[in-house]
């Protein structure tokens, strides 16, 4: 498996995706399901495929993905990041184009923690003068 598969790990919010690519017909499997069945929204599928469209490798690779944690949007972002890293592992000359598009950089935005005395992260408790 090590010789023919290239891999990459992607992260976004609280989601982690392990991506394995090999030469094939363009079949994408997420957690043993087809990508259409796993992601309900078309925008999530588009986000996942962005690195492949950018590098013109849509029908070149079979992709196997294991993803856990977070919601649909975070998982789609993690898959995109993982596919990008796997493509760079396959061919390092793709890195400048992927980096220019902003796919190589890990999106570091996380949920801000709830503070003591507040209702949420920044929303304060209602104040009453009387």
UniProtKB/Swiss-Prot annotation:
InterPro entries the UniProt entry points to: Ribosomal_Su5_D2-typ_SF (IPR020568), Ribosomal_uS9 (IPR000754), Ribosomal_uS9_bac/plastid (IPR023035), Ribosomal_uS9_CS (IPR020574), Ribsml_uS5_D2-typ_fold_subgr (IPR014721)
Family matches, as PROSITE patterns: RIBOSOMAL_S9
Molecular function in Gene Ontology: RNA binding; structural constituent of ribosome
Name under which the protein is recorded: Small ribosomal subunit protein uS9
GO cellular component annotations of the record: cytosolic small ribosomal subunit
Biological process terms in GO annotation: translation
Gene name as annotated: rpsI
Keywords on record: Ribonucleoprotein, Ribosomal protein
Family: Belongs to the universal ribosomal protein uS9 family.
Ribonucleoprotein found in the keyword field: yes
Keyword Kinase in record: no
């Amino acid at each position: 498996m090590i010789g023919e598969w290239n891999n990459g790990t992607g992260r976004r919010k609280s989601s982690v995706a392990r991506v394995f690519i090999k030469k094939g017909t363009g079949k994408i499997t997420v957690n043993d399901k087809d990508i259409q069945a796993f992601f309900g929204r078309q925008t999530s599928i588009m986000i996942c495929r962005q690195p492949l469209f950018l590098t013109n490798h849509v029908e070149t690779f079979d992709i196997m993905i294991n993803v856990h944690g977070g919601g649909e949007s975070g998982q789609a972002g993690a898959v995109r990041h993982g596919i990008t890293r796997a493509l760079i592992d396959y061919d390092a000359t793709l890195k400048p184009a992927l980096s220019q598009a902003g796919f190589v950089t890990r999106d570091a935005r996380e949920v801000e923690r709830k503070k003591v005395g507040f209702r949420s992260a920044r929303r304060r408790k209602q104040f009453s003068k009387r």
